[in-house]
Amino acid sequence: MAELVGPLRKQLADSLSSCRVLVVGAGGIGCELLKNLVLTGFKNIEVIDLDTIDVSNLNRQFLFQKKHVGKSKAQVAKESVLRFCPSANITAYHDSIMNPDYNVEFFRNFQLVMNALDNRAARNHVNRMCLAADIPLIESGTAGYLGQVTVIKKGQTECYECQPKPTQKTFPGCTIRNTPSEPIHCIVWAKYLFNQLFGEEDADQEVSPDTADPEAAWNPADAAARATASDQDGDIKRVSTKEWARSTGYDPIKLFNKVSALSQTSPYLFKDDIMYLLTMDKLWKKRKAPLPLEWEEINQLGSQEQVIGSGLKDQQVLGVQGYAQLFQHSVETLRSQLKEKGDGAELVWDKDDPPAMDFVTAASNLRMNVFSMNMKSRFDVKSMAGNIIPAIATTNAVIAGLIVLEALKILNSDFEQCRTIFLNKQPNPRKKLLVPCALDPPNASCYVCASKPEVTVKLNVHKTMVQALQDKILKEKFGMVAPDVQIEDGKGTILISSEEGETEANNNKFLSDFGIRNGSRLQADDFLQDYTLLVNVIHSEELEKDVEFEVVGDAPDKAPAPSAPEEGKNIANGNKDSAQPSTSSKAAVEDDDVLLVDSDEEPSSSTMDTESSNRKRKHHDAETDDASSKRKRLDQQPADDDDEDIIALD
């Protein structure tokens, strides 16, 4: 009979006490995980998290208290755990896991790595570091009632990046400024307006009508002419929005009536700005034209205003007059905050700062009204503006428990028993909330864990700069941290160097300036990640508007056409206003893979052939997943399009 130490066999208990574990993230899942680890018998734990504790964390991250607000999550989590398990050996790092100090050798110090992260970039990085160090990684995520845990092992399972994930949703500037069609467009505009008035000004966050919008011009020459007209007509003196606001003493009524600050006789925010947009009549051939607002008319509404909805104040939708008054009150409060900070001070928008949140709520709803959209409650605006998806403490607790169970299998040398486990919102037809699935084998075409990672990128070599190649393609798209790029031209030309000062002069040059053309090959190396990627360049002058590059086949999955995932992804973003989930966070969504199945255990998806495409649905990464984009089994009833189907990884 096996000797037991508590509920565990002695051999396994000894393994727990001697093994070193790295926990990446000390938030919702991380707090539960640290507690579970020490209570299970793990002694040597290192935890890293760059974040500090926020008031909004306290309802579910139980290791933190109000007195800890503003302090390091990792450090406070360590101190809290040691209070009920002083024998544990815990090291805390208040730092980013992407810091070069945490290199492959650092990862090789551990027998297990456990992710409790909330963003894709860090997940990608840890995935690559564990592959390079050949250390098992237990990946996890939650969103509302949904959750998942999976195990990643080099050469035996899919890595985190084996399956393609939809890119983060962004919006063209002309859509935000000229033709908003969804509430999120108005919310983004309102956040831009906050920065233009009270924060750090950014030329990319302009809120006035985009006179150079190509769609508004009858021919391309008109767009160019409009773009320069305001600088050429007469002695117009251009002033910034903030300068004009200061000159008025941040008068709320004047701010309501004026925003674009194209001149000292600037257009009005909800009236003349809109009147100007109406002169760009080509925009409204197939769209409903906006309806200008005027402060005096709104104040005449009086008792006609109604509040929509009942219950908590934040969940009520006010009328136009209510939001106009909220706009006035928030501006007065923000003006006082600026005055207290002194000359030259700036405010930073924070979803947890009531006046800042009130301002964005009011301004965005007034703009929604102008463009004939259903207005939103403060709760809904906050959900979208702050990319917030409600987190549930019990879901985090369940997922953290599953992480430890998978860890025990690995330490007990039972890797073949490891599973990807999904926590569903409702029981499946077999009345199961927790559904285990066999781990998938590596994807042979994965651009991360394949034996020779390779991708093909379509771009315009005459318009793509080296800086864009580095930042948008290699870092943002392919998750590199510090890439070095060499052109395979027989001479070994260095295009990008991670060493500071070596190739900065190349940044503002076009790829064609270095002889890169259709068919050129680039070798990109990230020595921190011990990762090499071969990039095949396809030159194209026919990319869609606002698209700088395309990954052919949407690597690593080369089967679907590029337009297919785009169509699915845009279902929700193109919804009519009335069809949108009340807490939908459509601004910036990231995605994580989750399988919704209806059997006690499913085989590896790689053995399902065509059926797999109907069985898989995407369980989105952060803080944000779109219910309407999820693929369901053909024989399955449609799931409710519910708020909690939005995915945030906590």
Curated annotation (Swiss-Prot):
Residues 590-603, 638-650 have a biased composition (Acidic residues). It is found in: Cytoplasm; Nucleus. Sumoylated with SUMO1 and SUMO2/3 and by UBC9. Sumoylation at Lys-237 inhibits enzymatic activity. Sumoylation at the C-terminal lysine cluster plays an essential role in nuclear trafficking. The keyword Transferase applies. Residues 572-586 have a biased composition (Polar residues). One of its GO terms (biological process) is regulation of cartilage development. There is a cross-link at residue 237 (Glycyl lysine isopeptide (Lys-Gly) (interchain with G-Cter in SUMO1)). Residues 554-650 are annotated as: Disordered. Zn(2+) binds at residues 159, 162, 446, 449. One of its GO terms (cellular component) is SUMO activating enzyme complex. Keywords: ATP-binding, Cytoplasm, Isopeptide bond, Metal-binding, Nucleotide-binding, Nucleus, Phosphoprotein, Transferase, Ubl conjugation, Ubl conjugation pathway, Zinc. Pathway: Protein modification; protein sumoylation. The active site is at residue 174. The modification Phosphoserine is found at residue 599. Disruption phenotype: Knockout animals show deficient growth, microcephaly, microphthalmia, mandibular hypoplasia and abnormal fins. CDD domains: Uba2_SUMO. Expressed in eye, brain and pectoral fins. GO terms for molecular function: ATP binding; metal ion binding; SUMO activating enzyme activity; transferase activity. Its main location: cytoplasm. Heterodimer of sae1 and uba2/sae2. The heterodimer corresponds to the two domains that are encoded on a single polypeptide chain in ubiquitin-activating enzyme E1. Interacts with ube2i. This is SUMO-activating enzyme subunit 2.
